A protein has these predicted regions:
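Protein kinase glycine-rich loop
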Residues: 7-13, 18
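Glycine-rich ATP phosphate-binding loop
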Residues: 17-37
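Regulatory alphaC helix of protein kinase catalytic domains
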Residues: 48, 52-53
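A short, aromatic-enriched beta-strand patch in the conserved N-lobe beta-sheet
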Residues: 68-70
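Conserved short submotifs of the Hanks-type protein kinase catalytic core
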Residues: 75-89, 93
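AlphaC helix of the protein kinase catalytic domain
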Residues: 91-103
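Activation segment signature within eukaryotic-like protein kinase domains
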Residues: 112-113
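Catalytic-loop of the protein kinase fold
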Residues: 124-143
Length: 144
């Protein structure tokens, strides 16, 4: 954890927190997904381990890049360090468009759709099709 400086919390969900961080060695901006596993069932812990292992193996331009993971056994917390997508997520994009009474252009919609399909094809063909996302929603589609 001494390799990173926390900048701010940028997300919160049932899984835990997402924090914007800066890697000390090169100043690169990344994020970490912070998950406390102390109250997880054995099955949930296994899913967490599987998620980390899958992220480590996936390498595709439309899948958020995995960099590292830190396990803090004392705090029962796992930190998954990943690429930062500065454009936010599609859920936020939709909310902002609704608020300003604007539309997302068809061209942008098709571009995002094609990238999501490309990422899903990669996931579904990885290790004989054993990788399923299980939570595809606008808030989980990030924009760089």
């Amino acid at each position: 954890m001494d390799k990173y400086d926390v900048i701010s919390t940028i997300g919160k969900g049932s899984f835990g927190l997402v924090k914007l961080i800066k890697r000390r060695s090169d100043g690169r901006t990344l994020v970490w997904k912070e998950m406390n596993y102390s109250r997880m069932s054995a099955r949930e812990k296994q899913q967490l381990v599987s998620e980390v292992n899958i992220l480590r193996e996936l390498n595709h331009p439309n899948i958020v890049r995995y960099y590292d993971r830190i396990v803090d056994r004392k705090e029962a917390t796992v930190y998954i360090i990943m690429e930062y997508c500065s454009g936010g997520d599609v859920g936020r994009m939709i909310k902002e468009c609704k608020k300003s009474k604007e539309y997302i252009t068809e061209e942008v919609i098709w571009k995002i759709f094609a990238q999501v399909v490309s990422a899903l094809v990669e996931c579904h063909s990885h290790k004989g099709g054993k990788v399923l996302h299980r939570d595809i929603k606008p808030a989980n589609i990030f924009i760089d």
